[in-house]
Amino acid sequence: MPETRTVERPGGRVVAYTSWGDPGGRPLLLVHGTPGSRLSRSPDPGLYARLDAHAVTFDRPGYGASSVHPERTILSVADDALAVADALGWDGFAVLGVSGGGPHALALGMRAPERVRALGLAVGGVPSDFIDPDDLIEINREGLRRVREEGRESLEAFLAEPAAKAASDPGGMLDAAMADAPPVDLEMLARPDVRTTIVESLREAFVNGPQGWFDDAYALTMPWGFELGDVSPSVHMWYGEADRNVPIKAVQKMASQLRVESFEILPGVGHMGWLLHEERVLRTLLDAD
């Protein structure tokens, strides 16, 4: 496993990050899903080298080796990401936000448009008020209901059981959370390379407890702190037609408020199926940089 490094943030916090691929390659910042960690990377171990990419992943606050940040917001995570880029000496870079990493990638584009040379979303999250809960898988539907009707404490109480499961049996937690996902997602999760990568990321995400997930999930359901129209870089978007984590109707509403460079709806694909197109997705961003 590659070396983990940290960058210090105000108040003595640290943000942990890991490099993959060629350190002299084209810079690519990958923003992991929810829950997740800096071990979220391609299941294809040779992909980054083939693309001449220096890919970097980082733990959002409370996940993995990054400190908890009680005041964390979508925008504060974007500032953490910029601190990682500074530590790497990156003046400009491509960014891909995956699932819950999507809003943070958009925030990064809003914060530093002069440095984000290409901005992509692969099944990236949408504003929660765009979502019809009936379009979601059970864990997301109930989590959103609790935030809307009962508040943060209820959300954390609901997530406590799957979080405990993730700490002891991340594979079991993954299976339980995705039990009512579309068949195409379950087929992807059955692939040993995909499953191993996701389970490793989940295990690391909860190594210091569940607070990272609690804070991350809550932040994603709240207003993001910026308007979609304030994101000046054009966005490349890849979404699954059958996704029940990020429903396509809500994605289309978000796209109508962004500057969209390209928007591809992947037919017959759920939340995980974008990985079938991963090399093309990353090449698009790196070649646009």
Show the residue positions of the predicted features:
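Conserved alpha/beta-hydrolase "acid-adjacent" motif
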Residues: 244-250
